[in-house]
Amino acid sequence: MKDFFKNVFATMLGVFLFGVAMTVFGFICIIGIAASTSATKKIEKNSVLVLKLDGSMSERDENNLMDELNGVTSLSFESTMKAIKKAKDNDKVAGIYLEVGQLGADLAQAEEIEKALLDFKKSGKWIIAYGESYSTLGYYLASAANKIYMNKEGMLDWAGLGGEKVYYKNLFAKFGVRYITTKVGKYKSAVEQMTADNISDADREQTQRYLNGWWNTILSTVARNRQINKDSLNAYADRVITLEAPENTLKYKMIDGLVYNDQVKNIVKKQLGIDEDEDINKVSVDDINGDETPVMGDHIAVYYAYGDIVDKTTPQGIFQSNHQIVGSEMCNDLEDLAKDDNVKAVVIRVNSGGGSAYASEQIWHQINELKKAKPVVVSMSGAAASGGYYLSSNANWIVAEPTTITGSIGIFGLFADLSELYTKKLGINYAEVKTNRNAVFGASGHSFTPEQLSMLQNHVNRGYMLFKKRVAEGRRMTVDQVEKVAQGRVWLGEDAIKLKLVDQLGGLDDAIEKAAKLAKLTDYDTASYPASSGIWEQLLNSYSNADDILDSRLQANLGEFYEPFKLVYSIKSMDKVQARMPYIIKIK
């Protein structure tokens, strides 16, 4: 018996020591990651900046520990733009090598990057693009290059733009679940996926409009950069040249050559004027951006506000990076910027399809307070719609790209009626005991009464009136003028400027330039806000690793169906009244 307990104790001790050893090993790995990410590589003469345009592009770098552990390089608009500008001004960088793949990004982001690439070429430097499989958006950016190459067995996705919306009403009905909506706005179609079985005429109209606008922008840019007729490009898309032999892509002059990976390296070496047996001095985005030196003096603050607008933080953990605009946090940040005497103007970079109407109102108010202290300019990225437009409307000046999705001035409420599921499908019975007739308003076992539905609709109506009032105040319009462009309709930036919803077409640089002008600055620096959370902060603040790993597995296995799944799942945690865009949009 004594030997038995010795063996048990020894086993337990061994397991404990193994756990300690693995924990220490994990922390050593994390220290190594932190050290490697902070190390700056020296840039040598005749170097090439390698831009990997593959995967999903975020607004800013997300410090995602799982990506770091897997050696995955994050792709962000902010870091990409900085790298191109620094490469242009660095005499040691001879050119840019675009390593293009299945890029997924907002077209508005791509518009700004394409302009930066063209500006890079104006300095006399060159750009070479290579891809094994080009997405439409990846090719759009590659068209800015001096030469475009594709693998001999590669593919170029060129078939136009389109997509499918999924409608869940009939699926939910099979389980006795019914979604009830209260909304204002003919075009406010965000609820249709839950309450309808097909697309409405109004939604089809607005969707067709922005798809046509996007496609025309892509066609015009590629036609200009590649000197190909737009009608020809449209004909190639109708024929779906994606599935044709790669040689046809060369014949259509969409690329300049079909080569293997090692062959394109020799092309780059020839461009650099070095022998084939010499190594290329490659510089990454992180290398050229280096460690940012904190801005100490007067500057313009660039505040990044992107993701769903929520009332409170949803735990994301160290393995996720679904960025959110948390109403209370953004209000605190803007209050701090108002008090900071070194901040002379604020540019808010918005990329959001909306979310909580309550949080949007709080941010609108805080921007109003911020304007009393210094100029506020909004730079709209891929989307600044519904709640995203709500908060943007109060800026002194609004800059949007022609392809930005904006407007969607409307509000809805979405409520799940689970009474049939519980009482008929599951056999659960409920008994009410109450002091007033609506005391169990929204209880799980009962449907909404006509009186309760009327109350909900009146609540949404009040929210819509406030939304229109806020837009009218911010844009110096009458409520009647706002109503004509509201009704939940989505607009492109190129339409929004005609409707006085935005002031200027352009990108982030244009917004910064306008902010400097409003603040009467001639010499200034910029600084990004809010401060990004580091790996250590993520470790200290996160205890949801299991959920994060599960989420990563779901994302990997569901693929394109992950976003609709996440939308349905997230409804349970949404504020009941939403100012939200109709859909999830990502161009590939």
Regions of interest found by a model, annotated:
Residues D3-V48, E59-D61, A94, D119-W126, ...:
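Flexible, low-complexity junctional segments that flank or bridge functional domains
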Residues L17, K169-I267, S419-L499, D503-Q504, ...:
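Charged, glycine-interspersed solvent-exposed loop segments at helix/strand-loop junctions
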Residues K42-K45, E292-D298, K424, K520, ...:
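Extracellular/periplasmic catalytic domains that process cell-envelope and extracellular macromolecules
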Residues S47-K165, P294-L421:
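Cleft-lining beta-strand/loop regions that shape enzyme active-site pockets
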Residues D275-K282, A400-E401, Y430-K434, D480-Q481, ...:
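Acidic/polar loop patches that form or flank catalytic/metal-binding clefts of enzymes
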Residues G297-I300, Y304-D341, H459, P530-K588:
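Intrinsic disorder and flexible/low-complexity segments
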Residues Y304-G307, V350-S352, M380-G382, A395, ...:
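Active-site proximal loops enriched in glycine and acidic residues that flank catalytic Cys/His/Asp
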Residues A357-Q362, D495-K498, Q538-Y543:
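Short glycine/threonine-rich loop-to-helix capping motif typified by GTGT followed
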